[in-house]
Each structure stands twice: as structure tokens, then as C-alpha cells.
A protein has these predicted regions:
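Membrane-proximal, glycine/serine-rich, low-complexity loop/turn segments characteristic
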Residues: 3-16, 135-139, 169-170, 218, ...
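Extracellular/periplasmic, surface-exposed regions of secreted and cell-surface proteins
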Residues: 1-152, 285, 289-367
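Outer-membrane beta-barrel transmembrane strand signature
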Residues: 21-53, 58, 148-229, 274-304, ...
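Extracytoplasmic gating/loop element in the C-terminal half of outer-membrane beta-barrel translocons
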Residues: 233-325
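Conserved small-residue
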Residues: 3, 89-92, 106-207, 238, ...
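C-terminal region/CTD detector
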Residues: 213, 227, 236-238, 317-319, ...
Length: 367
């Protein structure tokens, strides 16, 4: 059992921020739920490790299935309840499953070169297996299909499909899209009713990558050693919230400065642009959830690279040292990502700082 430590079942808990003193006023933020209980989980694992050819070839295979019941959620509530109508409740059941594979090779070659290379690949999937009727509206995009029926993973997002940019007034008039504009985003009419409504939404975002992978390489030769670690994910959706600032003028902070991507926005002399035309208002609601913000977040990163040298014993004996090693190390040195990804770091598509690149020099001594 786990999870209840993250939420409260009462309506009276007080949370103090900043100064740590009681504020001069209070407001209701949620309703009590005396029936709230802990989430429960059951997990099954199976795996094996192996070594072959006197330890030169080694690896492992692992698999797991994990079922979580009575998940804690904060479902939508009736607007008539007003402020403080939210309430934590036990809701969906979720099944997670996945596998991990690792394969390595180590060898000391006749030339004096030692190597140890390990590659790993893993994937996991999840599926909502139960969703109470009271929660269906929080996890559905039509009146008939919810997360259970769709087979989509937990955390999937619904939204509108962007077909492109309106090139002229004739396209706007024929679309039936409310408040459409020339140079604005054109949404797909999925239900074929000649207009854009909530029923034209579909599943647009999958939070689970196809697989993750890594590669460790360690080499040594006559006192020198070199190690590196590569890590990546493949076929992962990223919901790029930075586009609110980089691709639009009026969705948020209309009075603030913007990025240089706006210089390439659509206009009558730049009709091939995929960035909507600039506007001082957002009457077309172009910040709504849509495929415009979903990008390919696949990447490969050089997480760590280190070069070292162990001083010879003949030198160390003069100073009564047992070991001495100097090294140069770097972290987050290289990122290979999709050309279609517009944010700088696929791991930080929001407004967090990207992972910093760092380089360090070190000396290790033993006596």
C-alpha cells in the first residue's frame, strides 16, 4: 500500500508558505473524503543473468508486471460546487509491464588494450484497466471513448489535429472554424460536421517512448583509461509548452519580449511558414491542446566522458604513494535530437533550465 502520504482526505489541513506564519485570510481548496484509502500494488518480476566464454560475454534479461489499484486522482467536479469543490478520490486501476535487456563484452587483447562494452535496452507500457464512471469525464475525449476503451497509456493527452495554416479568406470561410483567420492554425474536422467542436478532438500525445537505450564503453591501455556513457530514448512525444512564447505573440505575456522564431511567422510574403501569423489577440484560441505543440522528443546524449592516466609505480615509489591518477571529465557534452524539435532540450520542453554542460579536472591520490 502506498500513495496516501501525497494527499489529504480532509478539508481543513492548513498549508503555510513563504514566511511560515498564518495568513490574514483563508479560502477553501477542497472537500473532505472520509472514504479515501491507500493505493495498492502487486508486482511480479522474472529475470536471468548469464555469462559465457569464461566471462567475456555477459548479460541479463528482466521482465515485470505491476498492477496498481485504487489510484489517487483529483477528478473533475460540478461547477455548481464553486471554489473548493475539488476532492481526492480513489479511481483507476493501472497495469504496467516491461522488459530490460543488457549485453556486455569484456576482453584484454594481446596488444595490451583492455575493453568492457555494455549495451542495454528497455521498454515499458501501461494501460488503464479500470476507470469508475465518476472519473470517465476526466479521462475521455468523447462521450464514448475513455482511456480504458482506447488502450492508451496513462498520461495520454487529447487535443485537436492541426492540418496547417489558412492561406486565404476562402479557406477560412469554407472551414466553419469559429474565429478562424488568414495565417492562423487550421484544425481538422474529424467528425465531418463542417465545424470545429470538442468532438473533433482525438488522442494526440503518448507519454511512453517506444524504448530507451544506453551504451557504456570503458577502455584502458598502458596506464590510460577512457570511459563514456551514452543514453537515449526513441519515438517519444514531447509537448513543447515553450511554443506559447516562441511561436505566438498573444497567447501569454503579450507585453513581453519574444524569441526570434517569430521573425519567420506566416505573412503574405512568407506563405510557406508553419508558424502562425502574428496577432495581438487570441480570439481563435490557438493555445488549445493540439498537435502543433507535440513534437518528436527522441534523443541520444553523451552523458559522461572521462579520460584518465595512472602514474607508474616507479614514479609513485619516490613519494611513498600507492596510487595517483589524473583525469579530465565532462558531463552532458553532446545532444543529438530530431530536427523537428524546436526546444533546446528534449528533456525540458517546459520552462526549466536545460541540463548544464560541465567539465572538470581531478586528481586522485593513494598512500
Amino acid at each position: 500500500d502506498y500513495g496516501l502520504d501525497r494527499v489529504t482526505s480532509t478539508a481543513y489541513d492548513l498549508f503555510l508558505q513563504y514566511s511560515g506564519t498564518f495568513p490574514s485570510g483563508y479560502r477553501a481548496t477542497q472537500l473532505a473524503n472520509p472514504n479515501l484509502k491507500w493505493e495498492s500494488a502487486e508486482q511480479f518480476n522474472i529475470g536471468t543473468d548469464f555469462t559465457l566464454f569464461k566471462g567475456s560475454l555477459y548479460g541479463s534479461v528482466d521482465g515485470f508486471v505491476k498492477d496498481v489499484d485504487d489510484m489517487l486522482i483529483n477528478p473533475a467536479y460540478l461547477g455548481a460546487l464553486g471554489e473548493g469543490g475539488a476532492s481526492w478520490a480513489n479511481g483507476p486501476s493501472l497495469r504496467n509491464w516491461g522488459m530490460e535487456f543488457a549485453l556486455g563484452y569484456r576482453k584484454n587483447l594481446a596488444c595490451g588494450l583492455g575493453l568492457d562494452v555494455t549495451a542495454n535496452l528497455d521498454f515499458f507500457r501501461n494501460k488503464v484497466t479500470y476507470l469508475p464512471e465518476t472519473s470517465t469525464g476526466s479521462y475521455a475525449h468523447t462521450t464514448t471513448e475513455n482511456l480504458v476503451e482506447s488502450g492508451r497509456p496513462y498520461g495520454s493527452i487529447v487535443g485537436y489535429v492541426v492540418e496547417g495554416i489558412f492561406q486565404n479568406q476562402a479557406e477560412v470561410d469554407a472551414s466553419g472554424q469559429p474565429n478562424a483567420r488568414v495565417g492562423g492554425l487550421k484544425y481538422a474536422d474529424l467528425d465531418g460536421k463542417n465545424g470545429i467542436t470538442a468532438d473533433d478532438q482525438t488522442w494526440i500525445y503518448n507519454p511512453v517512448p517506444a524504448f530507451s537505450y544506453g551504451l557504456n564503453i570503458a577502455l584502458n591501455y598502458k596506464g590510460f583509461d577512457l570511459s563514456m556513457f551514452w543514453q537515449g530514448v526513441y519515438d517519444k512525444d514531447v509537448y513543447n509548452n515553450q511554443k506559447f512564447q516562441t511561436d505566438f505573440w498573444s497567447i501569454t505575456d503579450a507585453g513581453s519580449n519574444k524569441g526570434n522564431r517569430l521573425l519567420g511567422a506566416w505573412n503574405t510574403n512568407n506563405t510557406g511558414s508553419t508558424i502562425p501569423a502574428l496577432t495581438t489577440n487570441n480570439t481563435a484560441d490557438e493555445g488549445r491542446s493540439s498537435t502543433y505543440f507535440v513534437e518528436n522528443g527522441s534523443y541520444l546524449k553523451l552523458r559522461n566522458l572521462q579520460l584518465g592516466y595512472n602514474l607508474p609505480a616507479s614514479f609513485l615509489s619516490k613519494f611513498k604513494m600507492s596510487s595517483a591518477r589524473v583525469y579530465l571529465s565532462g558531463q552532458n557534452l553532446l545532444t543529438i535530437k530530431s530536427k523537428s524539435l524546436t526546444c533546446s532540450d528534449p528533456e525540458n520542453p517546459d520552462w526549466n533550465y536545460p541540463l548544464a554542460t560541465s567539465i572538470s579536472f581531478g586528481l586522485q591520490l593513494g598512500f
